[in-house]
Regions:
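Cytoplasmic-entry segments and transmembrane alpha-helices of multi-pass inner-membrane transporters
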Residues: 56-87, 144, 168, 250
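Transmembrane alpha-helix signature in integral membrane proteins
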Residues: 26-57, 70
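C-terminal transmembrane helix and the adjacent membrane-cytosol boundary/short C-terminal tail
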Residues: 64, 133-144, 148-149, 219-250
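Faces of alpha-helical transmembrane segments in polytopic inner-membrane proteins
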Residues: 49, 71-80, 107-133, 164-168, ...
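Non-cytoplasmic
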Residues: 93, 170-207
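Membrane-interfacial helix termini and adjacent extracytoplasmic/periplasmic loops
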Residues: 22-23, 84-121, 191-195
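Transmembrane alpha-helices
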Residues: 44, 129-132, 136, 140, ...
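Interhelical loop and adjacent transmembrane-helix boundary motif
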Residues: 24-30, 191-230, 234
Length: 250
């Protein structure tokens, strides 16, 4: 059933339902589901990549470790256009990665959904790694030493001791990554452009609607992003508060 049909019948409906239907009709659902898919994929990738990186940061004794921490934190302070520009160059047809990808698929990574995933992973890296590393560092070293004395492997200790004790940090990192990916704009625009159904996310859609002076549609999409971010952060804070309330006091 089309939006036009709903608008035609809205005079016979209650005002509240009419306004809700109008808001739904103003929403770009193609951009919504593309953004949601991007956020899910980026969060999953950063869970896989972020855990080993965070583990190394938390437990490594290398004297130059701070350089790696600085590299991980760079996306927080760099302007999105700067980061997006260098990611775009790295994914272009003249780069080794771009040539390799083009030899396999026949097209470059730039201005594709796959390229968007890579750019978003880089841009959201600190939002996953830093909470992970902080939660790993907070694990009582006596438990790790006891595990080593008992002959338990580091791999098993990681999954049986560190991960359960760091679960609140993992939830925080995952939620921040998801929320940050949904709201990305600069890197998304630089790396993916504005291709409907391919790289146009909700943030790009808002930009388009504002340029077209379509403030009603821009407001609807902005409210959706605001609601998603608020709900995610509320769930994270509620979860962490419950975890800390159950944590034994010294």
């Amino acid at each position: 059933m089309t939006c036009e049909h709903w608008r035609g019948d809205s005079a016979e409906l209650k005002n509240e339902r009419s306004r809700a239907i109008t808001l739904l009709c103003l929403m770009d659902w193609q951009a919504f589901w593309l953004t949601f898919r991007l956020a899910v994929i980026v969060t999953a990738v950063l869970l896989a990549l972020g855990l080993p990186i965070a583990y190394w940061i938390a437990f490594s004794r290398w004297r130059w470790k701070f350089l790696c921490e600085a590299v991980v934190a760079l996306p927080i302070v760099l302007p999105p256009t700067v980061l997006g520009f260098y990611v775009l160059i790295a994914l272009g047809a003249r780069s080794p990665l771009g040539r390799w990808w083009q030899s396999i698929t026949g097209h470059t990574l730039a201005f594709t959904f796959e390229g968007l995933v890579i750019g978003s992973v880089i841009y959201s890296l600190p939002f996953a790694v830093q909470p992970f590393a902080a939660s790993f560092s907070a694990v009582d070293r006596r438990l790790l030493n006891a595990s080593a004395v008992l002959g338990v492997s580091k791999f098993r200790t990681f999954w049986r001791v560190i991960i359960p004790l760091s679960f609140s940090g993992l939830v925080t990192g995952g939620a921040l990554t998801f929320a940050h990916t949904i709201g990305e704009f600069g890197v998304v625009l630089m790396v993916g452009g504005n291709i409907p159904g391919v790289t146009r996310t909700l943030s790009i859609n808002i930009f388009d609607q504002v340029q077209d002076l379509n403030y009603s549609a821009a407001n609807t999409t902005s409210l959706v992003l605001l609601l998603i971010a608020f709900v995610l952060l509320s769930v994270v804070y509620s979860f962490n508060r419950r975890v800390w309330s159950l944590w034994p006091r010294p």
